[in-house]
Amino acid sequence: MALFRLSAAIVVIFLYIWSPSQRIQCRCRSFERCWPSQQDWSALNNSISGHLVNPRPVAYVCHDPDFDHDACEHVRYMANNSLWRASMPGALQNTVWESSLVSTQTCLPFSAREQPCNQGRIPLYAAVVESKKEVQTAVRFARKYNLRLVIRNTGHDGAGSSSGPESFQIFTHRLNSILYHSNFCPGGSHSKYQTCAGPAVSIGAGVMFRDLYARGAERGFVVTGGDSGTVGAAGGFIQGGGVPAFMGYTWGLAVDNVLEFEVVVATGQLVIANADENADLFWALRGGGGGSFGIVVRVTMRTYPDLPTLKGELTVSGNRHDPSFWTEDIAGLLNALRAFNHLDAPGVFRLIQTSAKGSISAVLEVYLLNRTLAEDLTRMMGPILGTSRRKYNISPITVGKISSFANPNEPTITEFFGSTILSRNFFESPNGPLVMAKRMAAINLDPGDGLLTSNLGGRINNENSDLPLHPAWRSSAHLVSLVVNVDTSLRARERAMVRLTDELMPMLYAIDSSQWVSYSNMGNPNEPDFKERYWGMRNYRRLVSIKKKWDPKDLFIARVGVRSDGWDSEGMCRT
C-alpha cells in the first residue's frame, strides 16, 4: 500500500510538472489544455462586437484543399499592394516574417497549388478592434489565458514582432481617428498642469502616414513622419524613435515632437502618459521600442506648416568593381550631401546593386524647404557640384509641399535590415565622405541589396529632450540603413540572416568605427548586442526598470526588444 501511495504521488507530481496549464515558463499554445475553449473565444467575440477573426495566410486560396481560382488570381494581383496588405490581418508588408523561422512552413501566392499552405507565423486569432474598450478587453483576455500577444497595425516590421506562431493578434488598423488641435494641452483643457503646447494632432493607432499627410494637406500642417505612406504613424515607427527621411534635420525626430500617449497597459487599464503624468512610461515610449510597454491607442504630436518645398535629384550608375566609381562618383554625391547640409538643405542618398555583375545605381535627393522657385535649388547646385556635375544626371526640380513627397503605396518587400549611425565628427572630417564611400565599397552587396541614408543632424543634434535612444543620436549626422534582399525558402532565409549578422553588419558598423550604434526600427533582427546598440546600457537598465513596473509578467515582448533576452526568439518560452 505504501508503495502504491508513493507511485501515485510520483504520477501526480509528474502530471503537475508536465501539465501544460502549469508550465508558467511558456505561453499557452493551441494544443494545450490551458488554451481557451471555443466558448471562451465566442465570449470574447461577443464582448468585442463580433470583431474576432481567424486569420489565414492570404495565399491559402491558392493551395489545395482550399484552392479558388478567382480568389487566388485576386491575391496574386494584390500581392505587392502595400495598402491591401495593411488591411489584412493574415498578411505582412515584409513577407519574410509570414513564414516559420525554424521549418519550411510557408504559404506563398505563386508557389505550386499542391504545395501545402501552412499557418507559419500568422496568428491563430485576431481581435480587429474598433475602440479603446475593445483593446482593453483583448489585452485582459490575453493576460488571463497567458497567450502570446502580438500587436499589428499595417504590418511594417523589420524584426517580425507583428506576427508569431500560435499567437493572438490585436489588430489596431481600424483605430483611425485624426483630430487637429490649434493649441493642445496635455492632460486635457482642465489639466492641473495647464501647459499648452500649440498646434498638434492626435492620431489613432491605425492611422497611416498617407492619410495623416492627406488630412494635413487639407489644413496646411505636417508632422515629422516617415516617407512610406502605409507605415502606421502611432505604432512601432514612433515608439522606436521615428526617423523621418529628411524632415528630422529641420524639426527633429518624431519622438522629439510627441506630446502625449494614450496607452492600454498590461492590466488592461487605459492610461495617459505625458511629461507630467506617468512620466516614466512617457519616456520609455519615446524610443524604447514598439510592442514592449503597452498598446498605444492614440498619440499626440506637434504639427508644423506644410511648407512649399523643392526637390532635386542627382543620379549616377557604375560598377562596384571599379574603384573610381566609389572614390569619385559616390564620394562626389556624399560630398554634395554634406555641402547641402551646410546650407540647411537635407538630403537622402540611396544605392542599389542591380545585377550579379556588380552594376550599381545611386541617387541623391535634396530638399529645400520654404522655397517655391526651382531656380533657387539650381543656383545652389552650381557651386556645390562644380565641374563634377557632368558625371551626374540631374532631374528637373520638383516643386510641391512637404506632404506631397511621401510614397503613397510602396511595393511589398522580402528583406532583412541593418543600420548604423554616423557621427557628426566623422562625416564632417575633411575626408569623411571619401572614407564613407570607400567603406561602403567594402560591403559585399548582392543583387537587390542596397544602402540608404536618412538625414540626422540639424535640429536632432540641438534637441535637449531626454530620450531612451542611444546618446550618440544627439551628435549624429546620418543614419545609414542596409537592405538585404531575401529569397523565400527557409535555407535562403537562414543563410541571409547569418550573412547579415556575421559578414555585413561588421562592415556596416565599420563605416564609422568610432561608434557602433543602430536604429531599432531598421536594425538587424538578430542583433546580438541590441541593448548597447539601440539604447546604451544606462538607458537600457532604466527601460528594464520601467517595464518591470508596467509589465512585470512580460505580456508585451518584441523580438530584440526590452527584456526579450529572457525569452526565446518567438517570445513563447522563457530561456
Curated annotation (Swiss-Prot):
For the modification Pros-8alpha-FAD histidine, the affected residues are: H156
Q: Extract the Gene3D superfamilies matched here.
A: 3.30.465.10
Q: Which residues form the signal peptide?
A: 1-23
Major enzyme class: oxidoreductase
Which residues carry a glycan? N45, N80, N370
The pathway is: Secondary metabolite biosynthesis; Alkaloid biosynthesis; Mycotoxin biosynthesis
Question: Where's the FAD-binding PCMH-type domain?
Answer: 118-306
UniProt EC number = 1.1.99.-
- UniProt keyword list: FAD, Flavoprotein, Glycoprotein, Oxidoreductase, Signal
Q: What chemistry does it catalyse, as a reaction equation?
A: peniprequinolone + A = yaequinolone E + AH2
Tell me which cofactor or cofactors this protein depends on.
FAD
* Annotated GO MF terms: FAD binding; oxidoreductase activity
General function of this protein:
FAD-linked oxidoreductase; part of the gene cluster that mediates the biosynthesis of the aspoquinolone mycotoxins. Within the pathway, asqF performs FAD-dependent dehydrogenation of the dimethylallyl quinolone peniprequinolone to yield the conjugated aryl diene yaequinolone E. The first step of the pathway is catalyzed by the nonribosomal peptide synthetase asqK that condenses anthranilic acid and O-methyl-L-tyrosine to produce 4'-methoxycyclopeptin. 4'-methoxycyclopeptin is then converted to 4'-methoxydehydrocyclopeptin by the ketoglutarate-dependent dioxygenase asqJ.
Q: Which family does the record assign? A: Belongs to the oxygen-dependent FAD-linked oxidoreductase family.
Cite the PANTHER family for this sequence. Answer: BINDING OXIDOREDUCTASE, PUTATIVE (AFU_ORTHOLOGUE AFUA_1G17690)-RELATED, FAD-BINDING PCMH-TYPE DOMAIN-CONTAINING PROTEIN
- Under which name does UniProt file this protein? FAD-linked oxidoreductase asqF
UniProt organism field: Emericella nidulans (strain FGSC A4 / ATCC 38163 / CBS 112.46 / NRRL 194 / M139) (Aspergillus nidulans)
